[in-house]
Amino acid sequence: MIDEKDKPYLEEKVKQASNILPQKIVDDLKNLILNKEIIVTRDEIDKIFDLAIKEYSEGLIAPGEAIGIVAAQSVGEPGTQMTLRTFHFAGIRELNVTLGLPRLIEIVDAKKVPSTPMMTIYLTDEYKRDRDKALEVARKLEYTKIENVVSSTSIDIASMSIILQLDNEMLKDKGVTVDDVKKAIGRLKLGDFMIEESEDSTLNINFANIDSIAALFKLRDKILNTKIKGIKGIKRAIVQKKGDEYIILTDGSNLSGVLSVKGVDVAKVETNNIREIEEVFGIEAAREIIIREISKVLAEQGLDVDIRHILLIADVMTRTGIVRQIGRHGVTGEKNSVLARAAFEVTVKHLLDAAARGDVEEFKGVVENIIIGHPIKLGTGMVELTMRPILR
């Protein structure tokens, strides 16, 4: 708090600081001073704003700074300290998640499918407080084929039939009934056939027009690969307690499919598949997930990297409107400079292709100027000096 007589002084100081500091920082400083329990004097107001301006000014990037190489070094150097392991996720035996350097490489390489795709699915109010309802949603999500609920299969050559022994425990675990299995088989175009069910959950599938054992084996494989329920790509869905609500963790990812399931909070669904985010939500969302995923990987390893380096990497990867990898098939391979492309990888190919097209080197970037020994246009090299000689 401050004395009433010092309020005009504070307002004047706020006005002056607004010319230098972002408005949010100025507002935060003002609220901090007004909400303090002790009285803040004019000298202390001066010290607060002077220190904020000093720290902010030191944090600014100087004109001409080589921000690209600084960002590369700032992320690459901590990357050498990362572990190369795949970790179990939160102590759950069924789920693994790639962390450390392998995950960082996946992100900057913009891989279409991560090595361990997974989703964190939040539920709507109706489902998130009740474990049974959350389990109901999880069972809708989990992709289940007939082979997942079968303990054994056999073929009766005499009657030309396929025998499926269903596993009652797996049926219960997956939330599937024998009728669900029969309906899934019924949807297949298998010709003329009949299903007989015995008391021990055994299905005997008799075919009328099959006279080849090879055809029978093919039909068996087709039946075992038949979908009963779920979203393609979601191999496993596990309900977990987080705070006062239940969430679902999945092994596998299918963002567009999951969003259509009743009970899923579409505003809170998370996936580590950057390409899916780009396809479903667009390039801005993809940029955001790149920033979040890189930050998470570094934080999990206990590494502190300035967010601006990560922002720059994400901006470069997404600036064309699509997610591009940082490599010869993406950002580096699409540089305008022939020498810059050749300096990275497959040198001869780039030079031959450029010669065949008649490309011209403009020498506007850093790499190409270093190659031929020209001064680079960074730092003091950005300035063109002229000298007026003193005539005597």
Swiss-Prot record:
It is found in: Cytoplasm. GO terms for biological process: DNA-templated transcription. Part of the 13-subunit RNA polymerase complex. DNA-dependent RNA polymerase (RNAP) catalyzes the transcription of DNA into RNA using the four ribonucleoside triphosphates as substrates. Forms part of the jaw domain. HAMAP family: RNApol_arch_Rpo1C. It catalyses: RNA(n) + a ribonucleoside 5'-triphosphate = RNA(n+1) + diphosphate. Coiled coil: none annotated. The gene is rpo1C. NCBIfam families: RNA_pol_rpoA2. GO terms for molecular function: DNA binding; DNA-directed RNA polymerase activity. InterPro entries: DNA-dir_RpoC_beta_prime (IPR045867), RNA_pol_Rpb1_5 (IPR007081), RPO1C (IPR012757). It comes from the Archaea. It comes from Saccharolobus solfataricus (strain ATCC 35092 / DSM 1617 / JCM 11322 / P2) (Sulfolobus solfataricus). Its EC number is 2.7.7.6. This is DNA-directed RNA polymerase subunit Rpo1C. The keyword rRNA processing does not apply.
